[in-house]
Amino acid sequence: MDGGPSATAAPRIESRAVSVLLITNDFPPRAGGIQQYCHNLVRRLPPGEVVVYAPAWPGAAEFDAGEPYRVVRHPTSRMLPTADVARRSVELVREVRPDLVCFGAAFPLGLIARRLTRETGVPCAGFTHGVEVAVSGVPLARRLMTRVAGDVRLLTAVSRWSAARVEKGARGRCAVELLPSGVAAGVYHPGVDGGAVRARHGLGDDPVCVCVSRLVPRKGQDRLIEAWPQVVARVPAARLLIVGPGPYRRKLGRMAASSPVAGRVHFTGEVPWEELPAHYAAGDVFAMPCRTRWLGMDLEALGVVFLEAAATGLPVVAGRSGGAPETVVEGMTGTVVDGRRAGEVAGAVAELLADLPRARAMGAAGRRRVEAEFSWEAVVSRLEKLLAEASR
């Protein structure tokens, strides 16, 4: 799920890399998807070519001591495009003398790019995620994002859907390239044993649909619970395992308790990162029927959980939101549904749970696709090429 475990002793790309200063508000040990995205990228680059500038956070000293590259911590727990952050960044660029400055999230920290390049001569690049796409609907934020595009040489996007919207906001002022999230394919794989998780929650050998994510409305756990009576009508032994914490937990619990199939819906609560692979492996099908909310302001830019599930060998039911459909090859590795419609969600999940041999075949196809397109090694190889082009 967002902020999931990284592979230990990650293999690094050994070709000559561009030296990079990563400036980011989002970095471990703080949890989160952007944090893990940045971490998984930099830890696979040659350590002598990377320096990270990130906020202070509880446990940062211990975390930093275990990393092979240098991490410089800002005095506070948040980094915004203030004069102080810009000044400290300029000083660090002058000390480190990187080939390129890269922002872990282009907005809003990318607003200091102009000053950095003007005062140091070092070009800048930035990663984009969901927020940069979402702000395209807000006039002031859209203008600021266009300014960032004019001050950097490269913006990356995690999906083709996101890239199209970033390109629209960039207005041709910089290159926009695809750089999806990767998956630690050695951590999430079909050989992981989910038996202990099944035993813990009394799932036995029943067919299980698992959903791993934060419990927030956009992710669609509510539609899964609403759909579950229809699923059980077709597959009487079917169980739903909802994994993760979040502010929607109480409401979801009330929904499940009032359902006629309440005994077939299970919540795990928050799970340690190292146990997430086993929770995926406890399922036969993965579903997260995400949906876009708030007039496009709340959406799924890609959805790394879909890739983690596929890496584990599960067929995926994804919601039609943002770039999420790009994680599925329709009919081959899973299916895409309208996450607003419980009936459509129920039909897709029940069809897979009712035919587990077909579900396993789709899961195997998903695993092969992850290995070919979404391994961190493949993603970092692409990143190195993009950084080299941006630094010239």
Language-model segments: what does each one mean?
Residues H189-L203:
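A short helix/loop element that forms part of the nucleotide-sugar donor recognition site in Leloir-type
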Residues W161, G182:
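Carbohydrate-associated surface elements
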Residues F306, A311, P315-A318, V328:
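Short hydrophobic beta-strand element within catalytic cores of glycosyltransferases
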Residues T327-A342, E351-P357:
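Conserved acidic donor-binding segment of nucleotide-sugar-dependent glycosyltransferases
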Residues E270, A281-L299, L314:
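Acidic donor-binding loop of glycosyltransferase active sites
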Residues R250-P277, V285:
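Nucleotide-activated donor-binding/catalytic signature segment of Leloir-type glycosyltransferases, i.e.
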Residues L21, T156, L203-K219, I225-P229:
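Conserved donor-binding/catalytic core segment of Leloir-type glycosyltransferases
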Residues A237, E351, R358-A372:
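A short, well-ordered alpha-helix in the C-terminal region of glycosyltransferases
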